[in-house]
Amino acid sequence: MSEVTKELLELVWGTKSSPGLSDTIFCRWTQGFVFSESEGSALEQFEGGPCAVIAPVQAFLLKKLLFSSEKSSWRDCSEEEQKELLCHTLCDIVESAYDSSGSYCLVSWLRGRTPEEAARISGSPAQSSCQVEHSSALAVEELGFERFHALIQKRSFRTVSELKDAVLDQYSMWGNKFGVLLFLYSVLLTKGIENIKNSIEDANEPLIDPVYGHGSQSLINLLLTGHAVSNVWDGDRECSGMQLLGIHEQAAVGFLTLMEALRYCKVGSYLKSPKFPIWIVGSETHLTVFFAKDMALVAPEAPSEQARRVFQTYDPEDNGFIADSLLEDVMKALDLVSDPEYINLMKNKLDPEGLGIILLGPFLQEFFPDQGSSGPESFTVYHYNGLKQSNYNEKVMYVEGTAVVMGFEDPMLQTDDTPIKRCLQTKWPYIELLWTTDRCPSLN
């Protein structure tokens, strides 16, 4: 794999200026796709960091399981069903990253070796003989950063059919200690290193943070949409003559982030309103998955929801109001009557105290009365967190709950203010959540 190793490693890990630190981060990423013993379709995450790959894979696996499978008991998965689900999901993500000028790529062990064999042949004779005496798991454990990358190869395929056969054939590899990294490299090489560099705002910023080990937004977006752009808004923007790339079409799986609730960013509708009711949920340090089985949640937006979205484009700081001078622009954007006399009449009605601002709530009630959300008012939801220590009784299982979406008025029911609720309120401002467990699901 020498022809791409240096470029690939710099793209993922950056310049390795501190070998000890990089090895520490690398070790946190060395795990396979392993299913929970307590939840047949849930993947486990052992250390902080690889959620940037595991959570998107989990989300697309749920999409396949809930909306393409004929299983009645979706939470019960046999080993054969797990194999089919995982391989189908990995293929879908690689396929979404495919660039028509390249080929489908898989990164695997050199000459088809198992990780145990690779570990035994890769070191000095003393090391190898020592490893032979230990379990195969320990042998894999001994593979460090340099040795691992010397023992992998790139394989190219011309058709999706060939790719699928190879992914199925290598099923055991995806579950071994390096499965997540081998899959990540497969996606990156399928997309093309230059294509990725051209999408990232700062090409010198690695996809995996060299200090904390977290995946970048570009990496998350690549796995979700097939494009490694650095931003989560709709379309491209220009700032000081520099083009900032965003999301260009509705995603199959969505993305919500606590960072929006904290006003660090604004997620666009292409990620916030995906094709399927499954969302990656980001905290400051971790990624989890929020999902439902009700497709009504992703029905086309109602006029009131469109109005809310348009209003908020004129309220970039999410204050809940706009200057009254912007009312005409908002009404024109929504194809409402916008002649000057009517605009002045509405200004006086919506701002009777003459404060010079128009509040979102009264605006929606004036022009879109009795129009709630186009989705259901109450629906069953689930939350997934791959870290054992973040789950009840340290068992990776889906947490079930009921979501209630209120109207514009002050909700009569108010549950606790929690990180997951604050995050979901960026999508459903008046959502309330009731979980079946004693404690609220953790985003970390």
Curated annotation (Swiss-Prot):
Example GO molecular function: cysteine-type deubiquitinase activity
Compartments where located: Nucleus
Class of this enzyme: hydrolase
E.C. no: 3.4.19.12
InterPro entries membership: EF-hand-dom_pair, MINDY-3/4_CD, MINY3/4
UniProt keyword Hydrolase, yes or no: yes
Entry keyword set: Apoptosis, Hydrolase, Nucleus, Phosphoprotein, Protease, Thiol protease, Ubl conjugation pathway
BP GO terms, sorted: apoptotic process; protein K48-linked deubiquitination; proteolysis
Lineage: superkingdom: Eukaryota
Gene3D superfamilies xrefs: EF-hand
Keyword Protease: yes
Main location, first listed in the record: nucleus
Reaction(s) the record says it catalyses: Thiol-dependent hydrolysis of ester, thioester, amide, peptide and isopeptide bonds formed by the C-terminal Gly of ubiquitin (a 76-residue protein attached to proteins as an intracellular targeting signal)
Residue list for modification Phosphoserine: S124
PANTHER family noted in UniProt: UBIQUITIN CARBOXYL-TERMINAL HYDROLASE MINDY-3, UBIQUITIN CARBOXYL-TERMINAL HYDROLASE MINDY-4-RELATED
Function: Hydrolase that can remove 'Lys-48'-linked conjugated ubiquitin from proteins.
Annotated family: Belongs to the MINDY deubiquitinase family. FAM188 subfamily.
Protein name: Ubiquitin carboxyl-terminal hydrolase MINDY-3
Species the sequence originates in: Mus musculus (Mouse)
Gene from which this protein is expressed: Mindy3
